[in-house]
Amino acid sequence: MVGLQPSEVPPTTVVKFLGAGTAACFADLLTFPLDTAKVRLQIQGENPGAQSVQYRGVLGTILTMVRTEGPRSPYSGLVAGLHRQMSFASIRIGLYDSVKQFYTPKGADHSSVAIRILAGCTTGAMAVTCAQPTDVVKVRFQAMIRLGTGGERKYRGTMDAYRTIAREEGVRGLWKGTWPNITRNAIVNCAEMVTYDIIKEKLLESHLFTDNFPCHFVSAFGAGFCATVVASPVDVVKTRYMNAPLGRYRSPLHCMLKMVAQEGPTAFYKGFVPSFLRLGAWNVMMFVTYEQLKRALMKVQVLRESPF
């Protein structure tokens, strides 16, 4: 590394792993209410006979939650969300380049689209397998409607939720919805990582941007839109299935068929606007932060290794 400027030193796998988890947590802190609104809109209409609060639009959903459940309600499940990102994003984003390099044939100048898709599917599936319990708990908290300040709470806290689910539903309950989630996140990861990778590469090759904030912003925004379009149907099924009580759905396929029968095919795009607002904003914040963190961490590493 002698003679190289910090910005020229390729980031190590450890730097990418830690940087991705940290950047994802920062993005979650800023966009979590949008994710909660998405979950509420996705499960609305699931039980037609139930008397429940009706949500209209993203802002309307958040305002209704604040009015009926208190100002902290849009951040319900945040702790589990941060648990999720530290394990989930670190793997699916932080290991993407390493897995892509592993799949790329030796001597190849660059990775093909097929290789990038394969890498995205691989890290997405790996991440879900490790982080699924955190996602189940996050969704349960986000979907839990607690009217008034004295409303009943099923879980006393995040750790209690892990224990309660394992006790009442078995350890398998913490991995409920793993298959639809693997499908969803393989799709999301491909759309996000591959789209970001390709857009950024083309912008740099065409000299429209240098490798800086505008380039990262445009690439991340495009990645967020593509991810929302292709992943929304699976995301709705995943949310419904993970949040459902025992016995409501026999399988993710049964959940999907019941949705179509009761609500029509448009149900697959319930919560699309908050999904896009959240994924678009999340991607911009995460990728921009991630790129800067990689540079900062490598600068620290180079300065520590440099004798002068």
Curated annotation (Swiss-Prot):
Family: Belongs to the mitochondrial carrier (TC 2.A.29) family.
Keyword field: Membrane, Mitochondrion, Mitochondrion inner membrane, Repeat, Transmembrane, Transmembrane helix, Transport
Topological domain spans for side Mitochondrial matrix: 33-73, 134-179, 234-267
Effect of residue 278 to L: No effect on proton transmembrane transport. No effect on inhibition by ATP, ADP and AMP
UniProt protein name: Putative mitochondrial transporter UCP3
Function of the molecule: Putative transmembrane transporter that plays a role in mitochondrial metabolism via an as yet unclear mechanism. Originally, this mitochondrial protein was thought to act as a proton transmembrane transporter from the mitochondrial intermembrane space into the matrix, causing proton leaks through the inner mitochondrial membrane, thereby uncoupling mitochondrial membrane potential generation from ATP synthesis.
Topological category with respect to the lipid bilayer: Multi-pass membrane protein
InterPro entries from the UniProt entry: Mit_carrier, Mito_Metabolite_Transporter, Mitochondrial_sb/sol_carrier, Mt_carrier_dom_sf
Activity: how regulated: Inhibited by purine nucleotides and inorganic phosphate (in vitro).
Subunit field text: Interacts with HAX1; the interaction is direct and calcium-dependent.
Family matches, as PANTHER family: MITOCHONDRIAL DICARBOXYLATE CARRIER-RELATED (PTHR45618)
Disulfide-linked positions: none
Mitochondrial intermembrane side: 1-10, 97-116, 197-213, 291-308
Solcar repeat coordinates: 11-102, 111-202, 211-296
Start and end residues of each stretch annotated as Purine nucleotide binding: 275-297
A GO BP annotation: lipid hydroperoxide transport
Chief location category: mitochondrion
Inactivation phenotype: Homozygous knockout mice lacking Ucp3 show no overt phenotype being born at the expected frequency, with no observed signs of abnormality, illness, or increased mortality at up to one year of age. They are not obese and have reduced free fatty acids and glucose serum levels. They show a normal circadian rhythm in body temperature and motor activity and have normal body temperature responses to fasting, stress, thyroid hormone, and cold exposure. The baseline metabolic rate and respiratory exchange ratio are the same in knockout and control mice.
Subcellular location(s) of the protein: Mitochondrion inner membrane
Organism lineage: Eukaryota, Metazoa, Chordata, Craniata, Vertebrata
Molecular function GO labels: oxidative phosphorylation uncoupler activity; proton transmembrane transporter activity
Transmembrane segments: 11-32, 74-96, 117-133, 180-196, 214-233, 268-290
